[in-house]
Design a protein with these regions (language model features):
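Conserved C-terminal RecA-like helicase domain
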Residues: 564-679
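Conserved segment of the helicase C-terminal RecA-like domain
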Residues: 714-743
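Interdomain helical connector at the RecA1-RecA2 junction of SF1/SF2 helicase-like NTPases
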Residues: 497-596, 613
């Protein structure tokens, strides 16, 4: 060994065997002794530990096993490890011949348990250099850490000053260490393998030869939990850059803590339907060792809660790829088992708010593997009613998983929270935390003792004089933050409101996350792929022509939307895009991930999704492509307005598997994973859809802000053989996408808190309408806050009756004023909900008006939207898809920030009108491209000829549209096109030279003429 490398090894050893490090210097003599032969552990050290911690049990065991009890003990230990795994045996021990043996003791939560502390101190923790791990060769591992003679961690060290790095250490594990060695048995001996040099640390939990996958175990370029990228920062104490590894991870108490509370064995079962209809079950398993940021965030949370108790909010900004599910599971377990210095549990229950089923399963498995005394995780899903949530809280279940929407039903049925403390973990925290359901969660769980004292002081009354049972007072007391509730909010994309509710307030008035694992770091460390690295944008260049003689006045915004929708759903547009989609899949996607790459098409509406589905099907059939399977995902059912008497489309009605069987909506994800190639979606699977084989996304929908990040991130999951992603965007310019991602690329903060008094501006504006009075508010309040009315279940009926005169006054307003009033009513309700999450206003009159407006907002009907149809007034004259960008969208290495949200003022709803010519010109200016005659959609002359043709008219009368389009119309079109060609060869030559254009024009005319001539009398 090189002297420089040796000094690095010695430095680490010297720390570990110091008083701070907690380990004992040892050699591998005990592992190579005759007593330990073929055991791959130090049996003498292990049995000495057992004798010292269970002396009576060992004596009993020796009486039972008179012949070589040590060998018998080893066999029992090995059987337990083979059956349950080393992690389980370390935590829970094993039972043999009626005797319970523990092979390791962990530090108790409370210092009051003296026996447990004594046994913990008896653990024999050895640091061994140059460990001879095999009897087949003389190879050694640089360093091994053993607990009571059992190898648990092995480390290969390299030093850049000798010309080697962590890459050499990883290669050594991959190529020079036989994974079949018993000492490296998966979950039987060594549990974690590290490669470390002067600057970087990597880790794996299973050796697989050259296939061994190492994960970065670095802090991040700015330090753990800080805003930065991959790597490690310069050491603050002048020591080695990687000193955190041995000081905060390998240190004895730290590593034993990881063995007890973090490292986890996960077993997953996946069922796959084979072509013959049979089911194949695949079982996989892995040992999960926490990544450094996961270890750091959980420990920081534990330390803060242990020091400060309940009552604090924590915002954890962890990117996709951070392992958020495990972080939540570890946080939940630690908070459920956390005790104070008096050995009292800090929290009575941990309540996890989530919509993810996979998290339920993961929590159940994780918690049960750690501590059997906590009981099982109680999941209140859609199969259980809200009463089950009430009972779980009242029974003091330690960990409860539920949705936010169940709290409004049971909030007043939960037993008094006085003296109780709750940890609320919010999975994917977002703006729903500012709604009424979040307020009801607080109403259910808040201990309002402190708020009551605060209110009494403001009212200048003694606490006992305050009518604490008054419903109005109760609701105000439940607002704001409470000393008995801690919120732990996890999200990758924190909005401004999320930051103000859960973030850390700073001296300068800004709000920041408690802990950060940024998108930038996740990408640089390779835990997610950069979805902006291969980005192509197209612009739809088209020209709309007016198809009427006059120039009618039409509502501007409606006309613009309608014309754009006309273009978006125009058959020619869909035909062109369908061709690009299919050819992109066949040329790009299909060749990725070993031929398993998949594509998602994100559409703007359910109708667009259905039409895309049919257009892609047509393109596949016309080109005889039989190697592309498409599926669709949308909610509910719909009919195509162009065919109102036709098929009613549903997701399950359109999807079939390879055997021709209908695919249930609940099976879409699984079947797409096994069989599908292209998935067309409409407002579905844009969040929470975890398909690692998804490589390409086609975007035909406007995306902004968080929605853009969440949608495009569907393709960022890593998978063996998946090296890149591809986005093809028909709608969004790169500047919009860059702006959306930049906000969440690194740390996201809020510049300053909201001005709470802005709600009084909204209140004043509302009163200016003269629609309701103080007397109206008092009448509604007297009903709402009357406990007898509530018991009789008469609240809704009485309030709706009281609001009838108010609704009548509202209906007397013109349409524009009605719209403005509705907006202001909803704004007051929304803003009061938000402010109530942050602070207690103790404004009785404002709270009454909030209740009044909450009911009024539900009773005021929106004005009916008048249907607006321009279909016969415009026509598509030019069309081209023009590629505008191809390459990477680069982001800057800087944090993002939000400005405080302001209440939106209600503008008028009345739409100004513009002449149709003006609107068409405006759209064409935006979308018109450089056109040649070859790009013109050749419709007009052919259309005029065919609409007069008797054969065309007769054909269009058929009720079977497919027969018309595929059998009758092509011959009529061909005859008409040839006649036009003979009349003007130059104008129509391109039509016959370009087969794709010929088909596109034919399909467009078939569609148009069928709609016009089918019902023409």
């Amino acid at each position: 060994m090189n002297e420089t490398e040796k000094r690095f090894e010695e430095f680490i050893e010297n720390y570990l065997i110091s008083e701070k490090g907690g380990w004992t210097k040892a050699t591998d003599a005990g592992y190579c002794s005759d007593e330990s032969k073929d055991m791959f552990l130090d049996i003498v050290t292990l049995t000495d530990f057992v004798k010292s911690t269970h002396p009576m049990a060992w004596k009993r065991f020796e009486r039972m096993c008179t012949i070589n009890p040590v060998r018998q003990f080893y066999k029992a230990f090995e059987n337990a490890v083979t059956q349950d795994g080393l992690i389980s045996v370390l935590r829970h021990g094993f039972k043999h011949r009626g005797i319970n043996f523990r092979v390791c003791y962990f530090k108790p939560e409370s210092e009051l348990n003296e026996v447990s502390i004594t046994n913990y101190q008896k653990n024999v923790c050895q640091c061994i250099r140059q460990w001879h791990y095999s009897k087949r060769n003389t190879n050694t591992v640089d360093m091994m850490l053993a607990v009571n003679g059992i190898p648990v961690v092995a480390i290969e060290l390299k030093n850049q000053l000798t010309g080697q790095s962590v890459d050499d250490a990883m290669r050594q594990w991959q190529y020079d260490r036989n994974p079949n060695e018993p000492a490296f048995g998966f979950n039987k001996r060594v549990l974690a393998y590290f490669a470390c040099d002067l600057y970087n640390v990597y880790m794996t939990t299973q050796l697989k030869g050259p296939e061994t996958t190492f994960l970065p175990f670095n802090q991040g370029s700015a330090g753990a939990g800080k805003d930065g990228g991959a790597g490690n920062p310069k050491s603050t104490d002048g020591s080695y850059v990687t000193s955190y590894f041995w000081e905060k991870v390998l240190q004895k108490d730290s590593l034993l803590d990881i063995l007890q509370k973090f490292i986890n064995y996960e077993r997953t079962e996946r069922k796959e339907t084979l072509p013959d209809g049979s089911t194949k079950k695949t079982i996989s398993s892995k040992v999960v060792f926490p990544r450094y940021h996961q270890l750091d965030v959980v420990r920081q949370l534990v330390n803060h809660v242990r020091t400060n108790g309940a009552g604090h909010n924590y915002l954890i900004q962890h990117s996709a790829g951070s392992g958020k599910s495990n972080s939540i599971a570890w946080t939940a377990y630690r908070m459920a088992s956390l005790h104070n210095e008096n050995n009292d549990a800090i929290f009575n229950s941990v309540i996890i708010i989530t919509d993810r089923r996979i998290l339920d399963q993961q929590l159940q498995a994780t918690v049960s593997s750690f501590d059997h005394t906590l009981g099982s995780v109680v999941t209140i899903d859609e199969k259980k009613n809200s009463g089950a949530l009430r009972d779980a809280i009242n029974d003091g279940k330690r960990i409860i998983v539920t949705t936010l929407q169940k709290f409004p039903v049971i909030y007043n049925e939960v037993e008094s929270a006085v003296g109780k403390h709750y940890a609320v973990i919010v999975d994917e925290a977002h703006s729903s935390q500012t709604g009424q359901s979040a307020l009801k969660l607080k109403a259910a769980l808040a201990d309002v003792s402190d708020a009551l004292a605060e209110y009494a002081e403001l009212e200048e009354k003694a606490i006992e004089e305050v009518e604490a049972n008054d419903i109005l007072v109760q609701e105000m007391l439940s607002q704001g933050k409470h000393s008995n509730m801690s919120f732990f909010a996890f999200t990758a994309t924190p909005k401004g409101k999320t930051l103000e509710i859960f973030g850390e307030p700073q001296p300068d008035g800004s709000f920041h996350p408690f802990h950060i694992y940024s998108m930038r770091q996740a990408i640089e460390e390779g835990f997610i792929l950069d979805v902006l690295a291969n980005y192509t944008t197209y612009k739809m260049c088209y020209q709309i022509a007016k198809n009427v003689q006059d120039n009618p006045e039409v509502p501007t915004s409606k006309a613009v939307r309608t014309i754009r929708r006309y273009e978006e759903l125009h058959p020619h547009n869909l035909q062109q895009k369908a061709a690009i989609i299919v050819e992109t899949f066949r040329e790009v996607t299909k060749k990725k991930i070993g031929g398993r790459g998949k594509m998602m098409v994100v559409t703007a509406s359910r109708l667009a999704a259905v039409r895309y589905y049919h257009e892609i099907k047509r393109y596949l059939e016309s080109n005889n492509y039989d190697d592309v399977e498409i599926m669709i995902a949308f909610s509910g059912s719909l009919k195509d307005p162009d065919d109102p008497t036709g098929t009613e489309y549903t997701e399950s009605g359109m999807n079939v598997d390879r055997n021709g069987n209908r695919v249930k909506e609940s099976q879409t994800k699984a079947v797409f994973h096994e069989e599908g190639n292209i998935l067309i979606v409409a407002e579905k699977y844009q969040t929470g859809f975890d398909e690692p084989l998804l490589h390409t996304m086609i975007v035909d929908k406007e995306l902004r802000d968080v929605k853009a990040v969440q949608t495009l991130s569907r393709v960022n999951r890593i998978y063996p053989g998946k090296e890149d992603t591809y986005i093809l965007d028909f709608v969004n310019p790169i500047e919009r996408i860059r702006e959306a991602f930049q906000q969440f690329y690194q740390e996201t903060s809020l510049d300053e808190e909201i001005n709470f008094d802005l709600i009084y501006t909204t209140q004043k504006t509302l009163r200016g309408f003269g629609i309701y009075t103080d007397e109206d508010i008092e009448e509604v309040s007297s009903i709402y806050f009357d406990p007898d009315v509530r018991k009789a279940n008469l609240t809704q009926g009485k309030i709706s009756n009281a609001l009838k005169p108010v609704a009548d006054k509202y209906n007397e307003l013109n349409q524009e004023r009605r719209y403005q009033f509705r907006r202001e009513v909803r704004a007051l309700v929304k803003w009061y909900n938000y402010i109530s999450q942050i602070t207690r206003m103790f404004d009785k009159e404002l709270h009454k008006e909030y209740v009044f407006c909450s009911y009024l907002a539900k009773l005021l009907p929106s004005d009916p939207v008048q249907p607006f149809d321009l279909d016969n007034r415009v026509k598509l004259e030019y069309y081209r898809l023009e590629k505008t960008y191809e390459g990477a969208i680069e982001l800057e290495s800087k944090p993002g920030s939000w400005k405080p949200t302001q209440p939106k003022r209600a503008g008028g709803q009345k739409d100004r009108t513009s002449p149709l010519d003006e609107i068409i010109q405006r759209i064409n200016e935006e979308f018109y491209g450089e056109f040649t005659d070859a790009d013109r959609v050749m419709v007009d002359t052919l259309y005029q000829k065919m609409r007069k043709d008797s054969k065309a008219k007769k054909a269009a009368k058929t009720e079977d549209r497919q027969v018309y389009e595929r059998s009758l119309f092509p011959g009529i079109f061909d005859t008409t096109a040839q006649e036009a060609y003979m009349e003007n060869t130059a104008a129509y030559e391109q039509l016959f030279l370009d087969a794709d254009k010929y088909q596109a024009v034919m399909r467009a005319l078939a569609d148009r003429l069928y709609k016009e001539l089918h019902d023409d009398k």
